[in-house]
Amino acid sequence: MKSIIFFTNTFVIIFILNINSVRADFTAKVQRVVDGDTVHVIDKAGKKFKVRLTGIDAPEKNQPYGLAATYKLTEILINKLVLLKSKPNNGKPYTIDRYKRVLAKIILDGKDINLSQVLRGYAWHFKRYQKQQSPSDRELYSEAEIDAKKNELGLWEEKNPIAPWKWRKMKK
């Protein structure tokens, strides 16, 4: 009897852990690029979402390189069918931030678009939220930022670019 209870409890724990690690992936068409890390999409059922690209923080539009980051993301994503990868949270199949945006990694043709924004120097790796990333993504995004900086790509052409989170504080 004890062994049955033990195995039942073990199964329940494993099941709960697996549910929490499942990612809610869905496809949607990009309708609008708001800025270098936010897009509007519509899914196959016609539901519209605002999506915040996880793991990165792009310059604000009125900040140096903000328009370039927005333009580059538009060039790549506008009217494209993409895969959105998000984590289930609070009973929803995806995570939503305080601005009611779905937090997601965007995949286009197998390529991580969030990471490519960092690689090209159009965004910082948003280390404040890196614990929400997988260890491999954390490492990839961090290395991408180091490489972009070393190669003076995009915003790293400037000697000391101001990070968006600092820019927003200064503008309040």
Residue ranges and their predicted role:
Residues 2-11, 16-172:
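Small beta-barrel nucleic-acid-binding modules, primarily SNase/OB-fold domains
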